[in-house]
Amino acid sequence: MKLINNPDRSQWAEILKRPVMNTENLFDTVRGIIDRVKSDGDRAVLEMEAKFDKAELTSLAVTEAELKEAETLVDEKLKAAIRLAKQNIETFHAAQRFEGKKVETMPGVTCWQKAVAIEKVGLYIPGGTAPLFSTVLMLAVPAKIAGCKEIVLCTPPDKEGRVHPAILFAAQVAGVNRIFKAGGVQAIASMAYGTESVPKVYKIFGPGNQYVTAAKQLVSLRDVAIDMPAGPSEVEVLADETANPVFVAADLLSQAEHGVDSQAMLITTSEDLQQAVKEEVERQLELLPRKEIAEKSLASSKLIVVKDMEEAIELTNEYAPEHLIVETADYMQVAERVVNAGSVFLGSLSPESAGDYASGTNHTLPTNGYAKAYSGVSLDSFIRKITFQEIRPEGMKNIGPAIEEMAANEHLDAHKNAVTVRLKTI
């Protein structure tokens, strides 16, 4: 980890740079896979599963027998943990339900919104170095609450053609309708365009590597919506001298073990804490089974000391982290001033891991500074709001002349006439 003390503002942009994930050079490769899936459907996906995931499959769909078997393979303690997490995620997201109100903007003119679920959604759950069954809950639970009629899930199988049982169990608990053995670009293409087995969906959710990210970008240009721009995962700890270095180091490492391109940052007002955290990270790193991954991630991570909390908050808002842990004496007051972050964890007993798994908030969040403009996944991500308006005779008399005047000045005579012909009948 790099130690930085009292950087000049002119250095901030360089200091806050993320590990680069360049998808531009991948587009030709990714486009070729997408085109194969569009033209050859299941056959193309099966061939690519054999090529990329080394899985010789005869069909893509997960069977009822596989789902029943998965339930017997998951440890009872893990089942209980998944059910608890599902309950909290459900409680938090159910509280986000939209209640539209009719508004009379002026006499005779009534406007309102209605929330409608996206009918078909696709969830992508990576395989990779860890089975992300928690992401199944984070995406499927709000989709179910929203009322999505078809919830499709794609996830890569192992070399034996099996999906991790915890992923299958979580999918059943959360209410996923159909599950398919497909990973990477071919999974995204399958959900974007449909195959003989995989239905076409209207919006695709879920994390993935640079190939998945590039695929989502390409299919979203004109064919299907996606959740948000994605990049490597990241955490920032914002701390003062009261922070526990053991906790801070543990939080930084919990992010670093995600992947070699993840980033962990400490911004603090205390040089003593900076040094203590460095030593504690080195100590805890030696104990991690995923030490090699975390070690590579830490190469792009930084421990930064600034002159005061004012500057720490300003630097934090400039960084706009995916996850922000505030471990200061006055963390509630500090939190009030945070305007750019995906999800914020307050106080010494609120690790990022809580939001990753079971507190109830969603862990599908904007990365790479997109927290300045994007929200994380919520119930709103799975719905559309349709606007309605009803104009009665009194309303047409009230707003008709204004519409005519505005349309005439924009030289849109047909727009004006649509009002004029109605006014003549009132």
Predicted features along the sequence, with ranges:
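N-terminal Rossmann-like NAD(P)+-binding subdomain of aldehyde/semialdehyde dehydrogenases
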Residues: 1-119
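Short acidic-hydrophobic, aromatic-tinged amphipathic segments that line or gate anion-handling sites
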Residues: 1-7, 178-183, 303-308
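Flexible, glycine/charged-enriched surface loops at secondary-structure junctions
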Residues: 98-105, 225, 262-267, 287-297, ...
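Conserved small-residue-rich beta-alpha loop and adjacent elements
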Residues: 103-169
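Conserved NAD(P)+-binding/catalytic subdomain of aldehyde/semialdehyde dehydrogenases
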Residues: 175-263
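A glycine- and small/hydrophobic-rich beta-loop-beta segment
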Residues: 258, 266-341
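C-terminal core of ALDH-fold dehydrogenases
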Residues: 318-426
